[in-house]
């Protein structure tokens, strides 16, 4: 959920604090147990640490980018405003997903992470809400067709970004459109701009 009435710096700090709480929860639940993996291979705890450190660094920036959309209501074309969001989303998911994969190979870590994510309110709605609010504000301003569902459109934009990052991680960037081209395609296919007669 969005953090009400905080300036952007405070919001970023609050997000970092929540990620740290998430990390503390994960460590407490882990109990500091060492794995019996062969020497030279990554320990499960190391993967969790790396993922949470990356999340602590990247998530506040990503949420701030989404929150800053509200400053663009009524300015420029809606699709032009969303294009850098889609590109930033692809970049964010590409970085975070690659660090997340080794973390979620353990079912128990996955369950603990889900619990911690719910408790910290850093789940998917943390990014869906600001994007939905922007689209709803543009719709109220008459710049998005009335039949558009802002929540569904926000989810579709984010899903398109996540999909590109996912495919890029598994098949490689050479087999996909560029990140810029994918961002353009994602935004274009939402068809949010009003068509002029």
Describe the role of every protein-language-model region.
Residues 80, 91-103, 111-141, 151-155:
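Amphipathic alpha-helical packing segments from all-alpha helical-bundle domains
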Residues 125, 139-187:
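Hydrophobic/aromatic-rich alpha-helical bundle segments in the mid-to-C-terminal region
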Residues 20, 27-30, 36-37, 47-62:
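Amphipathic alpha-helical segments enriched in hydrophobic/aromatic and basic residues
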Residues 17, 21, 52, 79-102, ...:
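Amphipathic alpha-helical segments that line or abut small-molecule/effector binding pockets
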Residues 1-31, 42, 48-49:
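Basic, helix-initiating cap at the start of DNA-binding domains
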Residues 57-61, 88-92, 96, 160-167, ...:
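Phosphate/oxyanion-binding loops and surfaces in catalytic or ligand/nucleic-acid-binding neighborhoods
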Residues 9, 16-17, 37, 48, ...:
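Short, structured helix-loop boundary elements
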């Amino acid at each position: 959920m969005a953090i009400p009435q905080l300036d952007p710096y405070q919001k970023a700090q609050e997000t970092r604090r929540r990620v740290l709480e998430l990390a503390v929860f994960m460590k407490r639940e882990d109990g500091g147990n060492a794995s019996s993996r062969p020497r030279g291979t990554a320990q499960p705890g190391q993967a969790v640490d790396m993922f949470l450190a990356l999340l602590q660094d990247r998530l506040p920036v990503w949420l701030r980018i989404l929150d800053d959309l509200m400053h663009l209501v009524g300015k420029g074309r809606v699709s032009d405003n969303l294009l850098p969001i889609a590109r930033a989303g692809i970049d964010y998911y590409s970085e975070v997903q690659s660090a997340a994969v080794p973390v979620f190979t353990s079912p128990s870590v996955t369950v603990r992470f889900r619990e911690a994510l719910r408790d910290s309110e850093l789940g998917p709605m943390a990014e869906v809400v600001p994007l939905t609010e922007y689209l709803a504000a543009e719709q109220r301003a008459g710049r998005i067709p009335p039949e558009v569902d802002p929540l569904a459109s926000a989810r579709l934009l984010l899903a398109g970004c996540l999909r590109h990052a996912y495919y890029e991680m598994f098949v490689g960037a050479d087999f996909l459109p560029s990140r810029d081209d994918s961002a353009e395609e994602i935004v274009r296919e939402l068809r949010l701009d009003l068509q002029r007669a």
